[in-house]
A protein has these predicted regions:
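Cytochrome P450
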Residues: 1-416
């Protein structure tokens, strides 16, 4: 296995200018060779059509695999222990599995994400949102109208509390889960910090699973515990990874969706007015946010199982590949005025939840959370506005997801 194509660009681990970076990369085409943290080369897929082609289901003749054994650099020992993206590639579970194993693992967790089960979570989410809005109102009153970080107080708490309810996370472990999930997405922190937080997360998951074995409840973790061993693939190791993946996939990306939708509406008051007038649906806002912001960022990793040509690039067997959901959502060959936030656009096509075999299992839950959270927020705070110039609000550190480090707002008057 060889990987000879040189990297033409460096993928910024801080993610501070993701849109500008993507446009600089795009000048070289829809498939661009980049350098990841630690100097490891990879391809970034920027083109919508190229991403669809790469991600489509090919059970008999796949182009790419999630199995790290296909990565030339890893096999050759060029990826050090503690490399910040390694934890995205080495854990045994749905995220790193290929068919048919992926199908077995997905079916293990799938019953928790049926339309009926998601519908049952609606009142739970509504209560979480209402409670967060009450907490914000109390904090705003005590602070006498000072600036509030909406990301910290609302955008992230809603999904982490929802995932906690889905999994049955005990209150005493919630903080550890939060720090561990953050570490997975922050490509700017040191390997030592990332490893420590990730280790603490795995320890907390082990503790929770042990408690569910002793005293199962009505939650996804307990459902998985009850079916351990019913198939060869249903092992404790995979159970732990399934819980970790549910936390990771359901937390920051959904928080970014809410964050970016609020940001988009506050910076496009004409569209916010149309939503309030009933001329634009919240579904349209959510779909356009997923396209425009690409909240899943640059998602690692896939590996070429053979040489192939895609988007004018010659991919070699053993090459690493990331799909840029920011890039695919702003592909000018697919979308008219790709940089414009416009929930009235005719097409709602986006790859915000992936495509093909690894399409996000929790997509309906993420959409439901946003559909509950966004109208409740804007109804409670009709005068909500940004407290800083939009161009000065920093990006969340890391290139794996796309949100803000903070979302400073003035809440304005509260509607009872």
């Amino acid at each position: 296995m060889t990987s000879a194509a040189p990297a033409r660009h460096v993928l910024d681990p801080t993610g501070k200018d993701v849109y500008g970076e993507i446009e600089r990369f795009r000048a070289d085409g829809p498939m661009v060779r980049v350098e990841m943290p630690g100097g490891r080369p990879a391809w970034v897929v920027l083109g919508y059509a190229e991403a669809v082609e790469l991600l489509k289901v090919r059970n008999r003749n796949p182009l790419v695999s999630k199995d790290i054994a296909h990565w030339a650099d890893f096999v050759a020992g060029r990826v050090p222990e503690g490399w910040p993206l390694l934890m995205w590639a080495v854990k045994a579970g749905m995220f790193t599995a290929d068919p048919p194993r992926h199908r077995d693992l997905r079916s293990w967790a799938a019953p928790a994400f049926t339309p009926r089960r998601i519908e049952r979570l609606a009142p739970v989410i509504e209560q979480i949102v209402a409670d967060r809005l009450d907490v914000m109102a109390t904090a705003a009153a005590a602070a006498d109208g000072r600036v509030m970080d909406l990301r910290a107080e609302f955008c992230l708490p809603v999904p982490i509390e929802t995932i906690g309810a889905l999994l049955g996370v005990p209150d005493d472990l919630a903080g550890t889960f939060l720090l561990g999930a953050d570490a997975l997405f922050d490509t700017a922190i040191t390997p030592d910090v990332a490893q420590a937080r990730f280790g603490a997360l795995l320890g907390a998951i082990e503790t929770m699973v042990d408690r569910k074995v002793a005293d199962p409840g009505v939650d996804l973790t307990s459902d998985l515990v009850k079916t351990l061993g019913k198939k060869d693939a249903y092992t404790r190791e995979v159970l732990l990874e399934t819980v970790r993946l549910t936390i990771v996939a359901g937390y920051e990306t959904t928080g970014n969706l809410i964050d970016q939708a609020v940001f988009a509406l506050l910076t496009h008051p004409e569209h916010l007015a149309a939503v309030r007038a009933g001329e634009v649906s919240w579904d349209a806002v959510i779909d356009e946010t997923l396209r425009w912001a690409g909240v899943a960022g640059n998602l690692p990793l896939r590996f070429a199982v053979k040489a192939f040509e895609l988007g004018g690039a010659q991919i070699q067997a053993g090459d690493a590949i990331l799909v840029s959901y920011v890039g695919t959502g702003r592909d000018p060959r697919k979308f008219d005025r790709p940089d414009a936030f416009d929930p009235t656009r005719a097409t709602r096509d986006h790859l915000g939840f992936g495509h093909g075999t690894h399409y996000c299992l929790g997509a309906p839950l993420a959409v439901l959370e946003a559909k509950v959270a966004l109208p409740a927020l804007f109804d409670r705070y009709p005068g909500l506005r940004l407290a800083e110039d939009p161009g000065t609000i920093p990006a969340n550190p890391g290139f794996i997801t796309n949100g803000h480090a903070r979302l400073p707002v003035h809440l304005g008057t509260t509607r009872a």
